[in-house]
Design a protein with these regions (language model features):
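A structured, charge-rich N-terminal accessory region that forms the first stable segment of a protein
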Residues: 1-50
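A structural signal for short, well-ordered beta-strand segments and their strand-loop junctions
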Residues: 2-4, 70-75, 82-83, 143-145, ...
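Long, charge-dense
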Residues: 77-130
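A charged, amphipathic interaction segment
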Residues: 125-197, 256, 262-266, 273
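Glycine-rich, aromatic-bearing surface loops/beta-hairpins
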Residues: 167-240
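Basic, amphipathic alpha-helix used for nucleic-acid engagement in HTH/winged-helix/SANT-Myb modules
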Residues: 220-263, 308-314
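Positively charged, polyanion-binding regions of nucleic-acid-associated proteins
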Residues: 252-274, 286, 299-307
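DNA-recognition alpha helix
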Residues: 276-288
């Protein structure tokens, strides 16, 4: 089984009702209940593999097909979603500074990613119990990629896993040690920034790091004997493959404030014809630093600002 976090890139465009930004504000439980009602009343659905897209999904799907594994997406809006599930296209995230973030909606009491998962778990909108899901599917090996935000969201689920289930997990991600239960720290595989170094044939962004690492690891598992190997055997296998790889040369870029990034985008809008990826490339080639997910949100803010200034509809 391969598990990856959801991204906001989707092939199908969500209707207004299925965007979190249009939900009423309230307590975290009220927001979760309202979200569940909207999802359950949606009349249009697609196979999950017709909705999710982007390089992280493509890399994970490639890995799943290569080893005939079930591919599962951890969704902040729907729980655990396998690729044969029928789901509506939607827009909801636990990432802050996003127009469809749950953080914009919870105005009563406090909120956090794990609290949101717990609130959704009390509804009938999807599957949220990791332990039950692993029990029903009984995978021999579980390859999991998590970002820090998603690790925070499913922390309690991971903490409840029995030792026999933990022994099946191989965890892929950068800087997760402080965001996962102590029982899973040992499960972290030795993949790091060498995946973007000069010796890697599959370089990419931080966003697709985990999926690229899983694909690399799957290629090392060339037979069933390796698939059923122990955690220590698998870590040695991966480290052996990476041992001669060099770290990438880190460019010396200046980190800009949010306001400076927005100003850069606004000033250079016509130079790249308003293209997001071209704009990020231009910003970085100009000696500036900005993480991809952060840039995406700031790009949308700058776009809205430009539309307002020009008197165009949002």
């Amino acid at each position: 089984m391969i598990i990856i976090p959801c991204t906001d890139r989707k092939r199908q465009v969500p209707g207004p009702k299925l965007l979190a930004r249009n939900l009423p504000q309230g307590s975290i439980d009220n927001v979760a209940q309202n979200w569940a009602k909207i999802i359950n009343s949606s009349s249009h659905s697609f196979n999950a593999n017709q909705i999710y897209c982007g390089r992280p999904f493509a890399e994970a799907l490639k890995a799943a097909n290569a080893c005939q594994a079930k591919l599962v997406v951890v969704s902040a809006g729907l729980g655990l979603v396998d690729m044969h599930s029928k789901i509506p296209t939607y827009g909801l995230t636990v990432a802050e500074r996003h127009s469809d973030s749950v953080s914009n909606l919870v105005t009563i009491d406090s909120w956090g990613p794990s609290m949101w998962w717990a609130s959704l778990k009390k509804t009938n909108v999807g599957t949220f119990d990791f332990s039950d899901y692993f029990e029903k599917n009984n995978p021999s090996l579980i390859l999991v990629h998590l970002t820090r935000q998603y690790a925070r969201m499913v922390y309690d689920e991971l903490a409840c896993l029995s030792s026999d289930k933990v022994s099946k997990i191989r965890l892929f991600g950068l800087g997760l040690e402080e965001f996962i239960p102590q029982s899973l720290v040992e499960c972290l595989m030795p993949y790091d920034h060498r995946m973007n170094g000069p010796d890697s044939s599959n370089r990419g962004t931080i966003t697709d790091f985990g999926a690229r690492s899983i694909w690399h690891f799957v290629q090392l598992l060339k037979n069933k004997e390796l698939e059923t190997g122990s955690l220590s055997q698998h870590k040695k296998l991966a480290e052996g493959a990476l041992s001669d790889w060099k770290m990438p040369v880190k460019p010396n870029r200046q980190r800009l404030t949010d306001e400076q990034v927005i100003d850069f985008i606004t000033r250079n809008w016509s130079a790249v014809s308003g293209g997001s990826q071209k704009m990020l490339k231009l910003l970085r080639s100009s000696g500036n630093a900005c993480e991809q997910a952060r840039f995406k949100n700031l790009f949308h803010e700058a776009k809205k600002k430009s539309q307002v200034q020009l008197g165009l509809p949002l």
